[in-house]
Amino acid sequence: MTDRSLIANAMADVEAQYGDLNDEVYALLFETYPEYLDLFLLDYDGGVRRNMLRTSLEIITNYAEGGDVVNRLEGARLSHFTYEVSDEIFDQFFDIIEQVVATKLAAQWTREHRQAWQDMQAAFTATAS
């Protein structure tokens, strides 16, 4: 298995076993970074949160399947710029997703998975301006 296929398989396993991770991801995000809750004050129905997670998962999946995600990442970063979301804050969302995925997969999540995720995040961070 390549590093990217570890991510692809992990994401497929989590989706098959647990479905929607929206509640878990945002619970951990706001527990870890309570100050980020203010960024979602106008998200009355959770649509922004669902869209943000869906976009992030699509980026992860595209990367894991060998796709080029540079334009998608740059576009997502740019759309967050108007909300004063720095590249560092933007990248932290992928940390949160990893923590949820690793927790869900428990013993299935190995050092190799962790390294593959770190490599992916390094590639994502490299797209920051």
Model-derived features with residue positions:
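Globin-like tetrapyrrole-binding proteins
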Residues: 1-129
